[in-house]
Amino acid sequence: MFTHLDENQQPRMVDISQKVAGDRRAVAQCIVQLPKAIKDYLTGQEIFLKKGPVIQTAIIAGTMAVKKTADLIPFCHTLPIHGCKFDINIVYQKRDYLEIFLQCAVNTNYKTGVEMEALCGVSVAALTIYDMCKSISSEIIIKNTKLIEKTGGKADVSQTPLYGLVLTGGKSRRMGKDKALINYQGQPHGQYIYDLLAKYCEQVFLSARPSQWQGTPLENLPTLVDRGESVGPMSGILTALQSYPGVNWLIIACDLAYINSTMVEKLIAQARQDLVATCYENADQGFPEALCGFYTPLALQLFTKAQNIGLHCPVKILQMADCQLIKPDNLFDIANINSPEDYGQIN
């Protein structure tokens, strides 16, 4: 039965007067694909055009749209908006275009949900980006608009996206080159892990320092550039958590030469959404292998707290929280390759 039709099949607004108010939340997302011409106007995470700062304007427009949803969608109820937050991140996708990932989260305490408000907000923010950038190029695509979370009401929706991070580092002194560029499987290992994660994740990124992969076989892969001073793997993990706080992260380091589909599938199958992370367990000492793990949005608060107190070791950070530890099928599965001798054992 369609609730927006009465007994005479005439449209109506649903009567919610008998419903009980409660906390409700919805998160929607979409992607705006922009041509490479826009890169000339990009500074950090903002696009500066004659019309003004694009991202800031999009956030303002999207917030206004959230509050005006009932004026735009005929049968939406007017309701109080208690919170509205946008997360917008610009990432490079290959050489010929870039993408803007938008998320809009809306909160209320009322009798009906706010999923339409979240969808309206993220859509208008995307349209605002289109409007401001169309003078540079009309080759702009708005895509993948969807609701990814709804809580409160009759039914919860939890479609937390899974993103992947290939955790790289600098040049290894003992190996003589960056581990992401070492060939274990007939291609640079960073490319191998990227392709592996792409089978399971909506988006995959390489961690990077500024310009780290220019002039290498990895230069066309999407990257997340470390925010602030680089302090090892912690920087890449925290940057990912900060860039997309509402998603799950499958994080694999290039140190792991034996990583394969079976290991990844086991990690995903046993992941706990109610915990900070699910990781493989170190066979010798029982600590979480932080560089081969499934991280939930709960990890952001933990890693931010660790950064604030000067703790930069991912293993020690995870030991501060409840984690799901799973045993590898083979002891060498999560072995780190740190020397030419280790590399020789593979080949």
Curated annotation (Swiss-Prot):
Signal peptide: none annotated. Pfam families: MoaC, NTP_transf_3. Pathway: Cofactor biosynthesis; molybdopterin biosynthesis. Its cofactor is Mg(2+). It is found in: Cytoplasm. GTP binds at residues 167-169, 179, 226, 255. GO terms for biological process: Mo-molybdopterin cofactor biosynthetic process. Substrate binds at residues 75-77, 116-117. Residues 1-158 are annotated as: Molybdenum cofactor biosynthesis protein C. One of its GO terms (cellular component) is cytoplasm. It catalyses: Mo-molybdopterin + GTP + H(+) = Mo-molybdopterin guanine dinucleotide + diphosphate; (8S)-3',8-cyclo-7,8-dihydroguanosine 5'-triphosphate = cyclic pyranopterin phosphate + diphosphate. Its EC number is 4.6.1.17, 2.7.7.77. Coiled coil: none annotated. InterPro entries: MoaC, MoaC_bact/euk, MoaC_sf, MobA-like_NTP_Trfase, Molybde_CF_guanTrfase, Mopterin_CF_biosynth-C_dom, Nucleotide-diphossugar_trans. One of its GO terms (molecular function) is GTP binding. Mg(2+) binds at residue 255. Keywords: Cytoplasm, GTP-binding, Lyase, Magnesium, Metal-binding, Molybdenum cofactor biosynthesis, Nucleotide-binding, Transferase. Catalyzes the conversion of (8S)-3',8-cyclo-7,8-dihydroguanosine 5'-triphosphate to cyclic pyranopterin monophosphate (cPMP). Transfers a GMP moiety from GTP to Mo-molybdopterin (Mo-MPT) cofactor (Moco or molybdenum cofactor) to form Mo-molybdopterin guanine dinucleotide (Mo-MGD) cofactor. In the N-terminal section; belongs to the MoaC family. In the C-terminal section; belongs to the MobA family. The N-terminal domain of the MobA region determines nucleotide recognition and specific binding, while its C-terminal domain determines the specific binding to the target protein. NCBIfam families: moaC, PRK09364.1, PRK14500.1. This is Molybdenum cofactor biosynthesis bifunctional protein. It comes from Synechocystis sp. (strain ATCC 27184 / PCC 6803 / Kazusa). The gene is moaC/mobA.
